Amino acid sequence: MREEVLTMGKRARQAAHHMAKVGDVHKRKALEHMALNIEGAEAAIREANDKDIRAAVAKGLPAAKVDRLRLDAKVLEEMACGLKEVARLSDPVGEITRMWTRPNGLRVGRMRIPLGVIGIIYESRPNVTVDAAALCIKAGNAVILRGGSEAFHSNRCLADILRRSLVETGLPEDAVQLVGTTDREAVLDLLKLEECIDVMIPRGGEDLIRFVAENARMPVLKHYKGVCHVFVDDEADPDMAMRICMNAKVQRPGVCNAMETLLVHAGIAQRFLPPMAEAFRAAGVELRGCERTRRIVADCAQAVEEDWYAEYLDLILAIRVVNDMEEAIEHITRYGSQHTEAIVTGNFERAHRFLQEVQSSLVLVNASTRFNDGFQLGLGAEIGISTSRLHAFGPMGVEELTTTKFIALGNGQLRS
Amino acid sequence: MREEVLTMGKRARQAAHHMAKVGDVHKRKALEHMALNIEGAEAAIREANDKDIRAAVAKGLPAAKVDRLRLDAKVLEEMACGLKEVARLSDPVGEITRMWTRPNGLRVGRMRIPLGVIGIIYESRPNVTVDAAALCIKAGNAVILRGGSEAFHSNRCLADILRRSLVETGLPEDAVQLVGTTDREAVLDLLKLEECIDVMIPRGGEDLIRFVAENARMPVLKHYKGVCHVFVDDEADPDMAMRICMNAKVQRPGVCNAMETLLVHAGIAQRFLPPMAEAFRAAGVELRGCERTRRIVADCAQAVEEDWYAEYLDLILAIRVVNDMEEAIEHITRYGSQHTEAIVTGNFERAHRFLQEVQSSLVLVNASTRFNDGFQLGLGAEIGISTSRLHAFGPMGVEELTTTKFIALGNGQLRS
């Protein structure tokens, strides 16, 4: 296996050298061609997908998991649309982000270039195969994909279509490669290929991400959990605060940017919490409050220390009443995951300070935490959300799949 | 030990929360105060330094190594000047690098924030203690320093002065901490502190850097070797090319941005190489050439495969004659270290293509490779040169010790 993975790595490196020089017109054509080929291969894709589905059912996988594997007509159409959208994004490669002149006349600048070879290790959903590859290609990279065993046939079929599309548009097929086995050994081999893979992006459960982070020799862009907070200040518009909290908790509770803990200023708690709690209960949300919350909200369960750390990903909410914004920020700093926090307030000074002092990947004023997403923030697409601070912090779009090199234009400058 | 390192990590995290909120006036004052305190403590510093020097001599360290340990009046003055220069750099923290408005009216931007806690593991030179700490502080971070055993007393004395200066200017002393022992166990413990240290920067020999890269759980900003190339095109001005090559090789041969391999276009080799070789020999440079070079340059040694990979860090130069720029770029891609490459040419098209296609941390046209340095490129100061592509590629200044978070300003936006 080691040998096979090494060969893939070397091929990826070669392909990356080629891809770095490809112009945007050519990359757009390839991505649009991928979309056409996926639309044209619906029967073959669904046949491969059926194999995975049948195996998953036979293995006794829970229905929700089986469902996430399914490539029906709607998912395939979304895939093709996604490819066309990525094709239309503006090309980050070659952009000169800044340029300045030194006293000796040397003109120095920074130019955006692809990262090189990107490794993506993911579980379950086969659409990642297409979405992730598209973004890597757009940014001029080569990609090595290693999907989960449950989606093996689907991933294989999709990767073959992407590779064929590259060849048909005159690009190197090895710009997209899928690891041919699903055993864990292959993952370990990949994680040691620091000379061939410039960055590894794990996508999946916390176990997978920790495994990758602990074993990778190359840099890892990773996303642990999202314990997101909304702080309702005493100068908040209560109606706006209720709408934002409801949206942040209920609109899609199973995702990383959903609110998990609500912090309420003591000055508004008496007014705000009773109707808010009623609305949450009507929406089926289980509430777990601090002592002060329980004095205001009848029949609220007692929150224990673990609740403040919890990423429920479910219709459960922890609630705490705090004396002021300082206490709210302290709570966020202590228990939060640096993912997404929002303040609802009409007070300029506090909005300003919350924005400055809360060090999460997205900090919002008067808007729902659910906006922490590449599409929603205007990046066009995303390959994940980084909660570590190096290179990228927050949603990663096509630009985060590039880096910058320095360039210098001289007329004979020497160092003295 | 594990316990002591963990305590340092937690203190650093606390200090980092504080430092992130400190305004630039305050940070400047602290850095200028450090400079004053170093100037005022010359006797104590030299006393501590003498202990290290005596131990190094007793241990039989080579004279060059002993010399690098020495903190004489000149080095101390440079340290103080460095502190004042860093104090005057513009503060990157809080800068909003971009802002845009989404169709729903949400205003989204990116704001520069400190990285948090930075770990620096270094060898030998005690001035790193001061230079590195200053840059970390300026960028609003806390830093944990782990210096080499040879400079133990010097580092301890300097770190104490920095910590005292922080306290005297009302900042948390734990923004600068020095690991109190020099055993390797402590390094391993540090490398596992991913929850407390956001990034690790190793500075020293290749062994140290590999050890850190292989064992760190947090991201690492690292610098392997610099196998730097100059390509002399057939449309180069021969005099300019000679001056640039001489500067790149001879001005300071022992550093990472010195030229190690010279690539010469076949169309200019007959004219260019004989006087160039003569000039190199006059400067004491040993030449190792390819077959074609040896046909032009008398008494040139034969370069073998390893020479193309070599970082000599000495007055030795590998020379290869290539048919065209494509062959030069292929050579650089195959044997280079992505550090620094220069082209000397009067041809616009080739200059343009070389700039685009060579993927090194600094690519120059008509200037010496020796400019790959934070001061020379105008970053004000540097904490090292990164040859890996994530987060930073090339010299790292104060801005590279920050990251950006997303901010969003709304008036009640919800996700639908």
UniProtKB/Swiss-Prot annotation, chains A, B:
Protein known as: Gamma-glutamyl phosphate reductase
Pathway it works in: Amino-acid biosynthesis; L-proline biosynthesis; L-glutamate 5-semialdehyde from L-glutamate: step 2/2
NCBIfam families, A to Z: PRK00197.1, proA
EC number from the UniProt entry: 1.2.1.41
Function summary: Catalyzes the NADPH-dependent reduction of L-glutamate 5-phosphate into L-glutamate 5-semialdehyde and phosphate. The product spontaneously undergoes cyclization to form 1-pyrroline-5-carboxylate.
Keyword Nuclease: no
Signal peptide: none
Gene: proA
GO terms classed as biological process: L-proline biosynthetic process
Domain of life where this protein originates: Bacteria
GO MF terms, alphabetically ordered: glutamate-5-semialdehyde dehydrogenase activity; NADP binding
UniProt similarity note: Belongs to the gamma-glutamyl phosphate reductase family.
Cellular location(s): Cytoplasm
Pfam families assigned to the protein according to its UniProt record, in alphabetical order: Aldedh (PF00171)
